[in-house]
Amino acid sequence: MPRSAVVERRTKETEVKVELSLEPGEVNVDTPVKFLNHMVETLIFYMGASGRVKAIDLRGFDDHHVVEDVAIVLGSTLDKALGDRTGLARFGWAIIPMDDALTLASVDLGGRVYFMFKGSFTRETVGDMATEMVPHFIRSLASSLRATIHVNVMWGENNHHIAESVFKALGLAIGQAIQVKGGGVPSLKGVL
């Protein structure tokens, strides 16, 4: 099974295209939000995946539409690449330090959508991205990926380090969950 997918989404606000392979390789992210580029590149790299993400902002209001739509399309692309999810590990978790910041992330790819984020930032932005968009990105990703995602920022002082520890931990957790373990459906019910 190829474990790759391409998804495009066009709205009156953005155009987003994501090409994703669940094999390691080159990652290229090009959006008008530079800090988002850094975070999405980090996420895909730590998932052990490769791909290209291209987003165009058609309205230019702020970072909200681009961040949200990239998360939606990335989640949809990953969902498509996973197929029927037979044989997946399904669960993944990581606790990642980034200097002063420490973040726990846990993922369940069982098809039930839920999102929980515990943590806070002391600045309104990191670079050109609003810090409120960090949890919103993850919420949007969880919804389109059909996943349960919990993120707990245990502590941190530097806002860049906090955000980066979130995306690294989430990437590693998703990377574990997408591993093929063999066998059937990863559920006692027999279906996801």
UniProtKB/Swiss-Prot annotation:
GO biological process, one term: L-histidine biosynthetic process
UniProt-recorded name of the protein: Imidazoleglycerol-phosphate dehydratase
Gene3D superfamilies linked to this entry: Imidazole glycerol phosphate dehydratase, domain 1
InterPro entries, sorted: IGPD_sf, ImidazoleglycerolP_deHydtase, ImidazoleglycerP_deHydtase_CS, Ribosomal_Su5_D2-typ_SF
Primary location class: cytoplasm
GO molecular function: imidazoleglycerol-phosphate dehydratase activity
Protein's cellular compartments: Cytoplasm
Pathway: Amino-acid biosynthesis; L-histidine biosynthesis; L-histidine from 5-phospho-alpha-D-ribose 1-diphosphate: step 6/9
EC number: 4.2.1.19
Keyword match Repeat: no
Keywords: Amino-acid biosynthesis, Cytoplasm, Histidine biosynthesis, Lyase
Family that this chain belongs to: Belongs to the imidazoleglycerol-phosphate dehydratase family.
GO CC annotation: cytoplasm
Organism superkingdom: Archaea
Pfam annotation, one family: IGPD
Catalytic activity line of the entry: D-erythro-1-(imidazol-4-yl)glycerol 3-phosphate = 3-(imidazol-4-yl)-2-oxopropyl phosphate + H2O
